[in-house]
């Protein structure tokens, strides 16, 4: 998993150089969302359910 993540970040940096203004904001948002999903999966058993519901509401607003 770590290897896959690393390669992905590398390709993203290349893409960022091409289109700086727009891609920067977009990539940042995507990263935040992804990290949140991963966290919920790890902790998920204790209070993951309530968190999932909350994230769903937020996603709709996005």
Swiss-Prot record:
Coiled-coil intervals, chain numbering: none
Keyword set, alphabetical order: Chromosome, Developmental protein, Differentiation, DNA condensation, DNA-binding, Nucleosome core, Nucleus, Spermatogenesis
Subcellular location: Nucleus; Chromosome
Tissue: Testis.
InterPro entries registered for this protein in UniProt: Protamine_P1
Function: Protamines substitute for histones in the chromatin of sperm during the haploid phase of spermatogenesis. They compact sperm DNA into a highly condensed, stable and inactive complex.
UniProt name for this protein: Sperm protamine P1
Organism of origin: Bettongia penicillata (Brush-tailed bettong)
């Amino acid at each position: 998993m770590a290897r896959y993540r690393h390669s992905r970040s590398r390709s993203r940096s290349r893409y960022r150089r091409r289109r700086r203004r727009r891609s920067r904001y977009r990539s940042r948002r995507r990263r935040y969302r992804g990290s949140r999903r991963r966290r919920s999966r790890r902790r998920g058993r204790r209070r993951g359910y309530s968190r999932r519901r909350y994230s769903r509401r937020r996603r709709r607003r996005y």
